[in-house]
Amino acid sequence: MVPTTESHENNMPDNAAITQQQQDATTSSSSSVATQPPQSQIPPQPQYQYQMAPPPQTHHVHPHHVHPHHQQHPGYVPSHHHHHQQHHHHHPHHVGVPNLHHSIHQQQHPGYVPSHHHHQQQHHHHQHQHQHHQHQHHQHQHHQHHQHHQHHHTSPMGAGAGAAGMPILSMSPIGAYQPPHQLTSLYVGDLAADVNEIILNELFSKVGRNAIASIHVCRDSNTLRSLGYAYVNFFNNHDAERALDTLNYTLVHGKPCRIMWSYRDPTKRKTNVGNIFVKNLEKGVDNAMLYDTFSSFGNILSCKVEFEKGISKGYGYVHFETNDSAEKAIEKVNGTLILGKPINVERFVSKVERYKVENKVFFRNADESITIEILQQELSNRFGEIESCILKNDANGKSKGLGLVEFKNQEDAQKILTESGALIISTIDGTTTVSSNGGTIEINGKPITIDRIKSKVERFTEYRKKTTDLSLFINNIDESIDRDLIKEEFAKHGTIIGIKIVQDENARNKGFGFISFSEIQEAQKALDSLNGFTFGSKQIQVSFSNKDNNQINNKLNGNSTKITKNIIQGGASASQYTGYLPINRYQQHLPHQHINPMYTQQPYFPQQQQSSSSSQPSSSQPQPSSPSHLNGNTTTTSPNTRYSKTLNGTTPFKKSNLPQNANGTNNNNNNNNTNINKSNNTTQSNGFRNKRVPNGKPRYNNNNNSSNNNNNNNTTTNVTTTPSSTETTTPKTTITLEFITNATAEEATETLGSEVYNLVLAKYNNNIELAAKIAGMIVDAVPEHKELFEIISNGQIQSKIEEAKSLLDQPDQE
């Protein structure tokens, strides 16, 4: 039999039925061959199809190619011999290469040739164009025939299956080759946790065996657990449409899967065009029922009922492809019954647009005697028709005095807000702004506070701004002092509206707290009077929790403080040894602007050996010490000595030195500060960290601050000018949740890190290196910006700082 480009169906043996069925399952169009990829795109694993061999007289095989076994089986010719005969004039170096594998195989199977023989015959008229392609194919021929012998004994194909125009059957797995055209993707959601790619392949193969290009189940990167959704890619759009129409909401492991078109462009997913909102749904309405209800009005891109813990929330969303379909659905379905309950269908309104519509008002401070019926009657008679009214009750059914009122018309809601004084309309430079501070109306002779609906971020921002302007931060509280004693003492200076002393699990105070006054003048008076006041065995430190007020009134210990910059330069950074953020990350945002230029003229390098006295500053020279009031307006800090030892002296620290005169001695010769310097110098030279007295404050007498400052100012006037009291170490910016929300991730991290850095400085005597370490630890431990903001705002940051400090003390205590 001679292989031609015509069909072999009349001469097809019985065992060819297998191959013919597989070809019918894939495609029967002759154009499929033309769409096959070039040789460079075909995977290296060959694909075979077996055909009947041609009669021996049709092949003019070179005598050198004939093996002795060929004479015994004249009906079988290896395809590569025919290949040599066709291209003998192109590849003369291939002539006469015997193949032992073909000789053995001819004795066992004298009627078959590999499929590439027929494939090359089809392209014989293109040999000048594909000469290089066929040459590469021939170079791998011996290896391919060896694989052919192994495969033929396990799954032989019938002859005649490679008729003209029929595609070559792929023996590789589905999806091994992706055509160059664009794939069509479907999103498959609401999947069970144990559903994988194999299960989805069995489901979607009902559309067509070779219709699927790939399947990907999305999983958690850490646990590799399924996230409950997957993407199925199809070769063409028709198969994807058929899968969406026939397989949507099919049960997969007991859960109906939700299929929708996958849009990589986020603008198509987030657009509100054609999106409708369906509410007042019965609990039994699921995704499939909602889809069937609206599918007759147009092509649905997505359809979903909101569930919480397996229970329907009573509302859902339907996203149509066009806006006309959505309008038609609203007109026809709104008010219809589903499971005996009328549903409400309306256009979807985004959250941003919802807050712009002022048809709802919030009320609070309502008397217990006022019920919903009284509210509805009074408000509807005075302002307009009411759509709904909600009054919150506690667990015992007692009214909380707050709730929501929804008017049918937006004008009625604006009317009650205007008459109550809740809205403040102001015009500045032609720009009109509307603000709301809450107003009051009377119902049954009793006042009720009325305000507009505000978002959570807006409410928290207003609360934060109001409380920080009137709140004081109290630090260094003795553990034996309770809340009532502090409240009693602070109440002498004004009306207290709130007090919070942070306690541990044993109900003992942690040494800090917050107290709020009704007026800013009262808070200022309490700060002036009680800052440095002795409670028990400790002197408390009082400051405004608002940084703007701290900028003006930072009177800690009766002096304004200055912190010189301490930046690690050269060598390895500190974060390489501690695992935390570098020191200068949070320093660069601190407004420590007023720094004497003489402070940064001489770098300081910690020595590796304490015995290197030649390079150490002499004991007569005051070394940088722990925070103390040396000249009334400046303090410097020393590196943590244990930290320097960890670096083994390899990393230099650029250290600011105290101002010195020509002979190398310090200009500050005040006797009260001399003892402090000597104590700190001794501690530094011995290689230990700076010591603190039990109450956590430096050794100095607070009663001598006035005289010390006068003496210091007199002795240092030739070096620097004392800055005004308004220049302090605290930043000018006030952190708000609105700023954190709108800022970029990097800006929010830097801002919150700087805030934590300042708090650690105030808590641990301006220890710059310790502050940088702890700030880095806390920022890394709480990566969520809003969570860290709440920890800072409610005072929990102090406990986090103490925990970080205890962790730093554990590894290498001396």
Swiss-Prot record:
Gene3D superfamilies: 3.30.70.330, c-terminal domain of poly(a) binding protein. Disulfide bonds: none annotated. PROSITE patterns: PABC (PS51309), RRM (PS50102). InterPro entries: Euk_RNA-bind_prot, Nucleotide-bd_a/b_plait_sf, PABP-dom, PABP_HYD_C, PABP_RRM1, RBD_domain_sf, RRM2_I_PABPs, RRM_dom. Residues 59-72, 79-94, 115-154 have a biased composition (Basic residues). One of its GO terms (biological process) is mRNA processing. Keywords: Cytoplasm, mRNA processing, Nucleus, Repeat, RNA-binding. It is found in: Cytoplasm; Nucleus. Binds the poly(A) tail of mRNA. Appears to be an important mediator of the multiple roles of the poly(A) tail in mRNA biogenesis, stability and translation. This is Polyadenylate-binding protein 1-B.
